[in-house]
């Protein structure tokens, strides 16, 4: 299936545009990685992640590393990533990249003329060009294309100008035709990189000594200042990315400390600095047997506020081994649980008489997944 068809299919299956919650502001730095030698050059622009590895860009190339040990290089195209014909036409700068569907989306500029801003698609495994690329309108991307951000849920991609940043450009992800322009609530110049996280566009700015992180609502254009990093004037902020894993979401941001003792680095942030998984204590049903159509009362303690995903599964087997097989039923659903004791009434009208399992998995606001619990429940026939 061609890429454009895959993108269109995903967009149609995604359904309605996701609701946007208030952007997260309490990111706390929990780690820092400094790159030495040639790695400092090769990781000096953008960063992206598929949750399994990290992708880095610099002016002329791309590389892929392990997340937890960036010294382990998994793929290397650091010196010849720009297609030959573009390199011959003075395209000399890869900006902040993004990942989606097994591809890397790389913005490539031809400064200082900025006559042809391209988005070039690469295979994320090999970091080789796929042959698909899209020319953005130079009439609006007047000083190149510093970054590209892919919004899979909405089927679009975003970019902006670097200096005159009162507008957000929204491109059709299947062909990169301009769909619309969103006017920002306030200018946000010198954005070096941006990524979508839970519906908002989070951006890293190279603004003075502050080096701010801001969030942009891509539908309304509302700009929310999240926090300043205050790294000083001799620091150049670069790319930004989100690493989503069961151990929680990390926001990573790259930057360059200039001067005689300069270096390139990546700083790692977590929501509230949280690195501890949530725990459910004594999850159980109030009654082990309920009549179909009544409520099954779920009781559980929670170590912190969580969103718990639950799904029913029907037990199949003989009386001696009633759960010899387990067959999932319905779709996963979510319930909110507060810190401390919780009592949740779950409907059973769709459950046929028999033995059922409930798989309950807590996730906290830092996106850390706790240990799942499997609870048994017998459903009997309703009274006549």
Predicted regions, residues:
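Blade-level signature of beta-propeller repeat domains, shared across WD40, Kelch, NHL, RCC1
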Residues: 238-275
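Short coil/turn segments that connect the beta-strands within blades of beta-propeller domains
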Residues: 51-52, 101-102, 153-155, 198-200, ...
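Blade-loop segments of beta-propeller domains
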Residues: 71-108
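Glycine-centered tight-turn motifs at strand-turn-strand junctions
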Residues: 320-351
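Structural motif
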Residues: 61-66, 113-121, 165-170, 209-215, ...
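Repeated scaffold domains used in trafficking and secretory/extracellular systems
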Residues: 41-48, 87-96, 138-150, 187-196, ...
